[in-house]
Amino acid sequence: MDLPGPIHDIFLVFLGSGLILGGLGVVLLTNPVYSAFSLGLVLVCISLFHIPSNSYFVAAAQLLIYVGAINVLIVFAVMFMNGSEYYNYFHLWTVGDGVTSLICTSILFSLIKTILDTSWYGIIWTTRSNQIIEQDLISNVQQIGIHLSTDFYLPFELISIILLVALVGAIAMARQE
């Protein structure tokens, strides 16, 4: 998708704000069903980030796999939980929540510092894939595999971390019976 500069920037700002709002919804909403729907918004926004870079197959695959299967499974699992027991034992703030918030905030800021200090263009897997594809000796499936393991390595790692955190949160909520 070849968009003009301002439209491309507006599209990325829209997706980024959707990611931030969805992430805040996952964490801050007390109703687990609404939290699961916010996770769906986050996964949709992450998959739509692949469209400006002309990787429509990756975007469609992420929509089908993560939103279409995983998030629906999480929504059904959350709906089968007994909601009244969850809300009876809900405490506003505990010491463990404060310690967890402090640890997560420090990890977040260390990740932000690491991401900002890293020279992403000097990493070998971002420049090597173009040399391989220029040979024209490989099929489309091999090109997708090369792009997934080189250019789109970071987005897939990020989505796997988000999915892992969501599943751990769903298990933690289910165990609070």
Swiss-Prot record:
Gene Ontology MF term list: NADH dehydrogenase (ubiquinone) activity; quinone binding
Function noted in UniProt: NDH shuttles electrons from NAD(P)H:plastoquinone, via FMN and iron-sulfur (Fe-S) centers, to quinones in the photosynthetic chain and possibly in a chloroplast respiratory chain. The immediate electron acceptor for the enzyme in this species is believed to be plastoquinone. Couples the redox reaction to proton translocation, and thus conserves the redox energy in a proton gradient.
Positions of transmembrane segments: 10-30, 32-52, 61-81, 92-112, 152-172
Statement: the UniProt record of this protein carries the keyword Cytoplasm: no
EC top class named in words: translocase
Lineage of the organism: Eukaryota, Viridiplantae, Streptophyta, Embryophyta, Tracheophyta
Listed name of the protein: NAD(P)H-quinone oxidoreductase subunit 6, chloroplastic
Annotated gene: ndhG
UniProt subunit comment: NDH is composed of at least 16 different subunits, 5 of which are encoded in the nucleus.
Family: Belongs to the complex I subunit 6 family.
Reaction equations catalysed: a plastoquinone + NADH + (n+1) H(+)(in) = a plastoquinol + NAD(+) + n H(+)(out); a plastoquinone + NADPH + (n+1) H(+)(in) = a plastoquinol + NADP(+) + n H(+)(out)
Annotated localization: Plastid, Chloroplast thylakoid membrane
Annotated organism of origin: Illicium oligandrum
Keywords of this entry: Chloroplast, Membrane, NAD, NADP, Plastid, Plastoquinone, Quinone, Thylakoid, Translocase, Transmembrane, Transmembrane helix, Transport
Membrane topology: Multi-pass membrane protein
Keyword Transmembrane appears in the UniProt entry: yes
GO CC annotations on file: chloroplast thylakoid membrane
E.C. numbers: 7.1.1.-
